[in-house]
Each structure stands twice: as C-alpha cells, then as structure tokens.
Regions:
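Transmembrane helix-loop-helix hairpins at membrane boundaries of multipass inner-membrane proteins
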Residues: 1-89, 176, 457-463
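Alpha-helical transmembrane segments and their helix-start/interface "positive-inside/aromatic belt" motifs
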Residues: 7-18, 135-147, 350-354, 429-436
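Alpha-helical transmembrane segments
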Residues: 14-24, 60, 92-96, 195-197, ...
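Hydrophobic alpha-helical membrane-insertion segments
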Residues: 16-26, 144-156, 360, 437-451
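Membrane-entry segments of alpha-helical transmembrane domains in multi-pass membrane proteins
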Residues: 47-58, 100-112
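Hydrophobic transmembrane alpha-helices and their helix-loop junctions in integral membrane proteins
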Residues: 65-74, 96-108, 120-377, 381-412
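Short phosphate-coordinating micro-motif centered on Lys-Gly-acidic
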Residues: 115
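Cytoplasmic/organellar membrane-interface segments at the starts of transmembrane helices
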Residues: 168-171, 221, 350-352, 403-466
C-alpha cells in the first residue's frame, strides 16, 4: 500500500538522526585514535575504547542503511500504518540497546542491554503476522533467553570470585577493575564462568550448536531487521565474549582461546555444509552468518594477527550481510517467494537489485576485490604462522564448500526466464544508491585498507592483549 506523506517525513527524520549517530561514532573513533586514553563519562561507567568505537560505528552504519530501506519509506511496501509504527519504535530501541551494550564499562549493564535486544527484536520478527514468523519469534525468544540466563550465571560466578579475592571494591563490575584483579582470581572458577559465558552469549551470536534459532528468525524477520540482526547483533554478542576472554586470559591462560577455536570450527563446519542443502535464499544468508561468525571465533584464537583478521571480518561481514538481506527483501517483495527455485531471471526483472545481490554474495564467498577476501586471507595466514596448519586446511575446505554452494544458488536466481506475473524493471532511488554505496565500501576495504581503519583495528587488538 502507498505510504502517507507524514510517515515518509518521519522515516526520513529517522534517517537523518541515524546519520548524526554515524557522525558521532566516527568522532568517537577519531577521539580514540588521537587521544591518549579511552573516552569516559559518569566516573568510568561509560567507557569507549577502540573496540567499543569500532562496534559503535558498525551498529550506527548498518542501522542507518536499514533506516533508508525500512517500511514506510515510500512506494508500495506492503506494510500498514500500525506495522510501520511498531517497526520504528522497536527497531530504534533495538539499536539503542546494542549501543549501550558496547559503550558501557559495566558487565551487568551490558548483560541487561543484550537481554533487551532479545525483547525488542522479538517484537519485530513477526511483523508480517504469519504463523511461521510468530513461531520463529517465540523460538528466538525462548532459546536466546536460556542463553542469556547462562551468561548471567557465568557473570555471577566471576563476580563472586572477584569479591572473594579482592573484597568489596567500587565499580567491581567494570572491565578495567576486573582485568586488574584477574591475575589473582581462581583459574578453575574462571574457567567454569567463561564456559557459561561462551555458551550463553554464543547462543546470541549464533555459534553452533546453539544456532538453531538463527535460520528461522533471520529468514522470517523483515529485511531491515534481518540486516541488523545478522550484520551487527551477532557482532555485539561476540563483543561480550571477547571482553570476557580478555579477563579470562589473565587468569586461565589458553583456556578461553581453545574454547573459542573449538566453537568457531564447529560453527564454520555447520554453516558451510548447511549451505549445500538450502532451498530458500533468506535461510541461505542466515546459515552464511553461522559460517562467518565461526570464522570470527577462529580468528580470535589465532594470536594478534588472527584477532586483527577477526575484527576486520566483523566489519566486512556487517556491510556485506546487511546489504544482502536488504536486497533479499526487495527480491521477496517483487517475486513474493523466498524459494530459490522460483526466483529466476533476476538480472532481467530487477537489473540493479540483481547486480548488487550478486556483488553481495560474491563478497560473502570471499572473492576479490571485496574486503572479506582480505580478512579471510589474513585469518588463514594467522593459522599457518601460529603452527595450526590443520586449522588453515579446515578453513579452506569449508570456504570452498560455501563458495560452490552459494555460487550455485546465485546462478539459479540470476539467469533464466522471468516468471509469469513478475514485473520487469525497477526505479533507481535512494535505496539502490545506498545499497550501491555498501558495495563501494566493500571494494575499498578489499583494495586499499584505509590507514585510519587499520590503526583502529591495531588499537582494538592491543586493548585485548594481556
């Protein structure tokens, strides 16, 4: 249905505010790079270092792109006024909670914020009000709530260990205080705490075998929400794991590294081989997210170079996957199906959308000149340099499987005859321009890694080293 003028004004106002948020995130990145200390406020309760600034930039950037492509932004998008209103309220709350999670120094507030992302996003998933979307929302809510409860148990264990060794200290739940006390904490208890934390936040991050909610939720949610969940929500959950790894590494040496490596390899195997049998393109993109979050987890276990590759991969994946899901939403609106077999002749029916969707998928399989090729190459190199050549071999095998599967599915969608009843042609509007800009970003990150980005990634790695 056509969107009222008032709704479009509100929509573009939201986009403008998101542009301001992106500018603020860029300022934070610059302040972290140019300053001698992290940006702090409220006596250290809010603390933005390089890692926080990097995630904040990803969150605001993806949210801004999603806002341009959101319901109520013009034309006939199939949403009524009530759906548009609910989407805007809860998506903005969702983005706010992600920002709170990565900018607070308090592990308790971070836990609350990540739990709040579950609630705010679960309301948006069934926006289409279909049986499948409602079921996916409940599945997501229940599984992730159990995971968050386990993360809470791990947080409580770590806090009790801290109190038993350091006593009652102001700001005891702040990262800086925990890291300072970590060498004197009990290794056995911290191992148990991190196991709970990894399973808990790993559920939210989509790490296998806790990933079972992800394909349903990402495939049933509206395209902008799918883009935000896959592009940055998984990264926020990994942020929590990485922060705790920085504490546990000072207490229990290589325990966290080994767990992350195991979880990453399992996720990579499950994600890549699941791509072979997919029949729906949104579920295909969802399982691709499991694969890529596995690569990030592996990189975090491969020393400084691996961590650099992992954070670069998070950035690349945020851009590529959000772009892919937003384009998938355009395809769904035109073809009225998510079945790969029923989407043919995409390049003829939607030349711009088809070309950009092809670029997004080629980026996700790690082909040059896109940025994911660089991060995956660095990850494999890190595995070899750390003496884990078998890890490099497994990664290359899984990347090959993912490449063949995704290219096969993509070819079936791009070519062939346009189905009867599908309109041919599309207008070039702001949405296409915005998505094309995402492709440009991926090419820039693949050809020439800008010096400020490289410096921010280096600073991010140094924040987490013992």
């Amino acid at each position: 249905m056509l969107v009222p003028r008032r709704a479009r004004v509100v929509g573009w106002s939201t986009v403008l505010l998101n542009v301001v948020s992106v500018a603020d995130s860029v300022w934070l990145c610059g302040a972290v790079l140019l300053g001698d200390a992290p940006v702090t406020a409220a006596q250290g309760f809010w603390r933005v270092d390089a890692l926080s600034a990097l995630l904040a930039l990803c969150i605001t950037g993806v949210t801004c792109v999603a806002a341009v492509c959101a319901p109520g932004m013009g034309g006939s998008d199939g949403y009524d006024a009530r759906q548009v209103r609910r989407f805007r309220i809860f998506v903005n709350a969702f983005a706010l909670m992600m920002l709170v999670a990565v900018t607070t120094s308090n592990v308790g507030i971070m836990w609350v914020a990540i739990e709040a992302t579950t609630i705010t996003s679960a309301v948006v998933i069934p926006l289409h009000r279909t049986r499948a979307s409602v079921e996916a929302s409940w599945k997501y809510l229940l599984i992730c709530s159990v995971g968050i409860a386990l993360a809470f148990a791990g947080t409580v264990l770590a806090y009790f260990d801290f109190v038993s060794t350091a006593g009652q200290v102001p700001n005891a739940l702040n990262w800086t205080v925990l890291r300072a006390a970590a060498p004197s904490m009990h290794p056995e208890l911290m191992r148990l705490a991190f196991a709970f934390i990894l399973v808990g936040y790993g559920t939210k991050a989509g790490l296998a075998p806790m990933h079972t909610w992800l394909p349903d939720a990402h495939s049933e949610a509206p395209a902008p929400m799918s883009a935000m969940m896959s592009g940055v929500l998984l990264a926020v959950a990994m942020y929590a794991i990485v922060r705790w790894k920085g504490v546990v590494d000072l207490t229990a040496a290589s325990f966290a590294t080994n767990l992350l490596l195991a979880a990453g390899l399992l996720s990579l195997l499950v994600g890549s081989f699941s791509l072979v049998i997919q029949r729906r393109y949104k579920r295909m993109l969802a399982y691709s997210s499991v694969e890529h979050i596995g690569l990030v987890s592996i990189g975090l276990a491969l020393g400084p170079l691996g961590m650099f590759a992992a954070f670069l991969h998070l950035v690349n994946h945020a851009v590529a996957k959000s772009m892919a899901f937003l384009l998938a939403g355009r395809i769904l609106h035109r073809y009225d199906t998510t079945e790969i077999a029923r989407v043919t002749g995409l390049l003829r029916a939607m030349p711009w959308t088809g070309s950009l969707f092809a670029a997004a998928v080629l980026a996700l399989v790690g082909l040059p000149p896109f940025g994911l090729f660089v991060s995956e190459f660095l990850l494999v190199r890190a595995a070899v340099l750390t003496g884990r050549t078998w890890v490099a071999a497994v990664v290359l095998l899984c990347l090959l499987v993912a490449f063949v599967s995704l290219i096969n599915h993509l070819n079936r969608m791009l070519y062939g005859a346009v189905p009867e009843g599908v309109k041919v042609g599309e207008a070039r509007g702001w949405k296409i321009v915005t998505l094309a800009a995402c492709a440009v970003v991926l090419v820039v990150l693949g050809l020439v890694l800008p010096r400020p980005v490289s410096a921010l990634l280096d600073r991010t790695v140094s924040v987490l080293l013992p």
